[in-house]
UniProtKB/Swiss-Prot annotation:
Organism lineage string: Eukaryota, Metazoa, Chordata, Craniata, Vertebrata
Source species: Rattus norvegicus (Rat)
Region of interest (Disordered), residue spans: 317-347
Family statement: Belongs to the universal ribosomal protein uL3 family.
Gene Ontology cellular component list: mitochondrial large ribosomal subunit; mitochondrion
Span of chain positions assigned to the transit peptide in the UniProt entry: 1-40
A Gene Ontology BP annotation from the UniProt entry: translation
Keyword Ribonucleoprotein: yes
Gene Ontology molecular function: structural constituent of ribosome
Pfam families: Ribosomal_L3
InterPro entries cross-referenced by the UniProt entry: Ribosomal_uL3, Ribosomal_uL3_bac/org-type, Ribosomal_uL3_CS, Transl_B-barrel_sf
Name of the protein this chain belongs to: Large ribosomal subunit protein uL3m
Location of this chain's protein in the cell: Mitochondrion
Highest rank taxon of the organism: Eukaryota
Gene: Mrpl3
Length: 347
């Protein structure tokens, strides 16, 4: 039932108009159309349809959707479905596509010289190329590839979005990211992406959403020192102090002040890849990025010191059925001490 009801009638016929009624005619020959807007305050709010399903029906629907997703992924990997796009060699200045991965957690890792490093485990789950946009339709400089990561629920997706994934033959994704690529690194829509896209020893840039802290003061948000704790100070202990001067009579944009902290996308540059597990599609990245169970964006590092490392990487991406020989289950950097190596040796 709509929240607003529109009533439009004329003259004395509105709301039982009569001689003394609300809609009484003003006079002979002066009948006018009067517009009334009445708000309905007792309408029932809408609910999601699955709230009224039983537990057996919910499990049945989830199993049905899971089977359909597996069937779509299996049909997509059929090499006879259509012709692949031509592949081009790597050139200086080439830019590859990136990945979307799920943060599983953190663990320690040791190098052969005994140094300990904290690494983040990022798992690539159902990552596919969704859309190719040529540079003529983007900004005239670089083309883009839209990548989707981690299969999501289709129960709350709009019909237009479901139709887009249905045309691709893929299940709907939980999130999508856009990567700028060069013309020689273009990949066909529907191509699956694996953790072997990155190799141990290279450096990557990781973008993730920081943990939200809510509304915080300047001491926690920006690390301000604060005001003195005593000696005549009253109610100013954690305040920022002066935010401007009197002669300019304004506060400059960008002044550090209290506000919402966290819950923003932040990029960490130049993180080393220590290990790659090809069986479970897990990338071991140096440092801490994102929070647990969050989706992160990984791409080749754009720092000038690492721009020429791409010539030793699979280009434009790793193909399991390509010319490259079969990879082992675990790939390690040459400086990492593998878990199977003995920790103590005797001469």
């Amino acid at each position: 039932m709509p929240g607003w009801r529109l009533l439009a009638q004329g003259g004395a016929q509105v709301l039982g108009g009569g001689a003394g009624g609300l809609g009484a005619a003003p006079g002979l020959g002066s009948r006018k159309n009067i517009l009334f807007v009445v708000r309905n305050l007792h309408s029932k709010s809408s609910t999601w349809w699955d709230e009224h399903l039983s537990e057996e029906n919910v499990s049945f629907v989830k199993q049905l959707v899971s089977d359909e997703n597996k069937a779509q992924l299996t049909s997509l990997l059929n090499p006879l479905k259509d012709e692949p796009w031509p592949l081009h060699p790597w050139e200086p200045g080439s830019s590859r596509v990136g990945l979307i991965a799920l943060k599983l957690g953190m663990m320690p890792l040791w190098t052969k010289d005994g140094q300990k490093h904290a690494v983040t485990l990022l798992q690539v789950q159902d990552c596919h190329v969704l859309k190719y946009t040529p540079k003529e339709d983007h900004n005239g400089k670089t083309a883009t590839l839209t990548v989707g990561g981690k299969t999501g629920s289709r129960l709350y997706k709009a019909n237009s979005i479901l139709e887009f994934y249905r045309d691709l033959g893929l299940p709907p994704k939980q999130t999508t990211k856009i990567f700028h690529v060069t013309d020689n690194a273009v990949i066909k829509q529907g191509t699956p992406l694996y953790a072997a896209h990155f190799r141990p020893g290279q450096y990557v840039d990781v973008t993730a959403k920081t943990i939200g802290k809510g509304f915080q003061g300047v001491m926690k948000r920006w690390g301000f020192k604060g005001q003195p704790a005593s000696h005549g100070q009253t109610k100013t202990h954690r305040r920022p102090g002066a935010i401007s001067t009197g002669d300019i009579a304004r506060v400059w944009p960008g002044t550090k002040m209290p506000g919402k902290m966290g819950n923003q996308n932040r990029t960490v540059y130049g993180l080393k890849v220590w290990r790659v597990n090809t069986k479970h599609n897990i990338i071991y990245v140096n440092g801490s990025v994102g929070h647990r169970n969050c989706l992160v964006k990984i791409k080749d590092s754009t720092l000038p010191a690492y721009k020429d490392l791409g010539k030793s990487l699979p280009f434009p991406t790793y193909f399991p059925d390509g010319d490259e020989e079969e990879l082992p289950e675990d790939l390690y950097d040459e400086s990492v001490r593998q878990p199977s190596d003995p920790s103590i040796t005797f001469a």
